[in-house]
Amino acid sequence: MRPWPKAALFQLAEEGFTSTFEQLLACIISIRTYDEVTLPVSRKLFARARTPAAVKALSWEELDSLISPSTFHERKANQIMAIAGQVVERFGDTLPGDRDMLLSFAGVGPKCANLVLGVAHGTPVISVDVHVHRVTNRWAYVNASTPEKTLLALETKLPERHWIDINRLLVPFGKHICTGTKPRCSTCPVLEMCQQVGVTEHR
C-alpha cells in the first residue's frame, strides 16, 4: 500500500525507534488517537526520553505535557510512568521482547503487545485493529463478529509469513480506501476479489 502513509509504529521503526520500550510507548500513545497525532507526539517524547530510565526520570507533569495531544493523555502518562519504573526495577534499562511480560503491564492488551513484538522483533504475530477486522471480514476472508475472533480466525487461516504484514498493509488500506462508511470501492485495487460484506453505500 505504497501511496498512503505507513501505520504509526511501522513509520517510527523506519525512523530508528525500534526498541521494545519505544514501540510500546508509541503503541500506548496511539490508543484512540489518530496516527497524525501519534507520530509527532511520539517523536517529541523520544527527543526528550527514549529509555526506561530516562522516562522514569521525568516528572509526571513533564511527561503528561509531552503527550498531551494524545487522547486520554493523563491516563497514558500514569501507565507510561508505571511501566518505566517497573522496567528499571526488574530489568535495568532494557525491556525484553516477551509477550507475557508486555501483557502484564496495565493498559497493554493483545493487539498492542502483538504489534510491538512484530515491529520491534519480527516475531510472527498478528495484530488486529478495527481496520484489519473490518477489511478481512468485508472481503469474507474471515467471518467474525469481533476483533478478538478475527485474530483467532486469521491465526488459523492466514499463512504465518504474512502475520506481521497484514497489519502493516491493511491499516493504511482501511484508512484511505476500505473505510468504515462509504468505502472507496471505485478506486479499490482489489475490488474484484472483495465480497463487499456489509457494504450498502460506497464511493
Map each language-model feature to its residues:
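N-terminal polyanion-binding entry modules of DNA glycosylases/AP lyases
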Residues: 1-97, 161-162, 169-203
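Catalytic DNA-binding helix-loop module of base-excision-repair DNA glycosylases/AP lyases
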Residues: 23-29, 80-86, 95-140, 150-153, ...
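Glycine-centered secondary-structure boundary/capping sites
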Residues: 122, 140-141, 198, 202-203
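Short, charged hinge/linker segments at domain and secondary-structure junctions
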Residues: 130, 145-148, 189
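Pocket-forming structural segment of enzyme catalytic cores
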Residues: 142, 146-161
